[in-house]
Amino acid sequence: MPLSLLQFGSLKIWAPLVNLMVIPIMTFLYIPVLLLTLLLAGFSGYIPNFLVSYLTYISQLFWEFLDYFAQLDHVAWGWPIHGFWSFVLLTLAAAIILLPKAVPQRQWAFLIMIIALWPSDQTLPKNHFRAEFFDVGQGTSVLISTQNHHLLYDVGARFPSGFNMAEAVILPILRQLHIEQLDTVILSHDDNDHAGSYPDLAQGIVINQVLSTDGLHQACIVGRHWQWDGVRFDVLSPYNLYPNFKNNSSCVLKVSTATTSLLLTGDIEQAVEYRLIQQHTDDIKADVLLIPHHGSNTSSTPEFVTAVRPKIAINSSGAYNQFKHPTEQVKAVYENLNIPMIDTQNSGRITLTTSLKAKAEYKVKQFRQQNPRFWRR
């Protein structure tokens, strides 16, 4: 239970009951028969048909039973715990509760549990924002949070198997951050790696508004701008809805405060980069740049990167991806301009927070650097 809260930010209420039912069935009705079947096969080479039928029947019942309870999302208790020590405290509390009743210290378990589950304050001050660049493999998903609002820029991919980045990555992190609704979701364009998991996201959280360039939602086009808690949001491209333009129809969003700015570029290619240089020369300047098109050779022209003049460039790409993003050519562009470059495939989730200190405009945290594991060495 503590491990489920740590990893997934929620706990299925039915989980203890399911374990009480499944473990005895597997222990007494399935595993002994399976071992007997293996022994018969090993010594005689013959497996009675009734044993195979029995094991198949039990397996089918087992998976149907688990699948039924897996669909009961509405009975999931969402209460994420924060960090390793909260996990340790919750595990300690669970162990104390299991002690014999005669042990006088059992009442301390509930106090320890309250401390472990006490929510941390994630509220930002006015005029500041936090950007979470999620590790969604070869795709993009960025959460922008202000004091009272949340925007999700792209949602990652969905695969034919049903596996999707909304359920695997985005929703668990939103629960961990105690985010119960999204004010706006922007689907930069309709490629699967940017918009594929939207249906799964919409089933898992309340979404107040969707902006896109595919004509199916409110239009994410030049001229749309708004302000949340002292943070300004400006759409810099496209000028109209051109779904057939694919990558070049990407919604380009600039997020800015008085001290820090972030430019989110989707999958724009060279043609749009040059147009932005010509028509938004001052607007595209930003402290932090989300590298266009995951670091493909189609984008990140030296002229565009020079015009943006970022102090740091963040790339969202999958480890060992088939496109070899970011390419050596793109990495050379940023290196030649002395712009530090970090990538989700190496850093995992990347968190950018505008700083409260006057001398520092922002701070960047890389999940894997802060949470090293021996198997990543």
Language-model segments: residues:
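Internal transmembrane alpha-helical bundles of multi-pass membrane proteins
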Residues: 1-90, 276, 283-284, 288, ...
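Divalent metal-coordination and catalytic microenvironments
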Residues: 21, 58, 135, 144, ...
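Conserved beta-strand hairpin/beta-sheet module of binuclear metal-dependent hydrolase folds
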Residues: 32-35, 126-173, 181, 246-269
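Glycine- and aromatic-enriched alpha-helical transmembrane segments of multi-pass membrane proteins
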Residues: 71-131
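Structural recognition of the beta-strand scaffold that forms the well-ordered cores
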Residues: 152-154, 183-187, 209-212, 234, ...
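Active-site-proximal loop/helix segments of hydrolase catalytic cores
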Residues: 166, 192, 196-201, 238-326
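Active-site HxH/HxHxD metal-binding segment of metal-dependent hydrolases
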Residues: 186, 190-223, 310
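Binuclear metal-ion centers of metallo-dependent hydrolases, dominated by the metallo-beta-lactamase
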Residues: 214-234, 241-247, 319-377
